[in-house]
A protein has these predicted regions:
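Solvent-exposed helix/loop surface patches that form functional interfaces
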Residues: 142, 152-158, 167-172
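N-terminal signal peptide c-region/cleavage motif recognized by signal peptidases
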Residues: 17-21
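Bacterial N-terminal signal peptides that target proteins for export
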Residues: 1-9
Length: 206
């Protein structure tokens, strides 16, 4: 199924690239997770109000389809469905359904806190906040443009916390922010509030 979708996607991309000017969206692009950003990194940029996107990311082992909408120019929301080819759907391999690839779904959201002016634009976001949390991450990110150069700097929790460079500053507000619950398959469809912005450390990205 994903192979067929991949073929359709490449055909659509070729057609789209021939009919839309390169600067139609002020250089904004969706990243691999269907969020406006660069590769795996989110930015504080947004598409215009009433913009909608449908993205595909085919990598190994993940294949992800994401539908993204911007009902307001300060809000971006998306729903994704993913197939993970190197994991089984469930543990009991004697059952045929368990031998298929693992499937997951979830939601992403990003909110603009400040528009760009003399100071950078500022946004806060959550990835995979309403699913199992397999891809869950939270972030605060700033973006600032200088002519054709767009600069971004952010702080990431969860899956964006790759190097564990700095202590999570929210621990100083409450000790509960210092522990992040592990991913569990049984919690799909639940909002796991005890995971948001929680971790012993954070990682800057730019």
């Amino acid at each position: 199924m994903f192979q067929k979708v991949k073929t359709i996607y490449f055909g659509f991309t070729l057609f789209f690239s021939l009919t839309v000017l390169s600067d139609s969206f002020d250089y904004n692009n969706y990243n691999n997770h269907g969020v406006v950003g660069l590769i795996n990194m989110p930015t504080a940029r947004f598409f215009d109000e009433s913009s909608h996107g449908f993205t595909f990311n085919f990598s190994d082992p993940d294949q992800k389809i994401t539908m993204t909408s911007s009902p307001f120019d300060w809000l971006e929301a998306s729903f994704f469905y993913t197939n993970i080819s190197n994991a089984n759907y469930c543990a009991d391999l004697e059952e045929p359904i368990c031998r298929q690839d693992y499937k997951d779904k979830g939601f992403n959201a990003k909110i603009r806190l400040k528009e760009e002016g003399k100071l950078p634009a500022l946004a806060i976001g959550l990835n995979d906040f309403g699913g199992t949390g397999l891809y869950s991450s939270e972030y605060i990110v700033a973006s600032y443009g200088i002519d054709n150069l767009d600069l971004h700097f952010g702080l990431g929790w969860g899956n964006l916390n790759n190097s564990e460079d700095f202590k999570n500053p929210l621990i100083y507000l409450h000790d509960s922010f210092g522990t992040r619950p592990d991913f569990t398959e049984s919690e799909g469809g639940q909002f796991q509030k005890d995971r948001y912005f929680s971790d012993s450390s954070i990682t800057p990205f730019f």
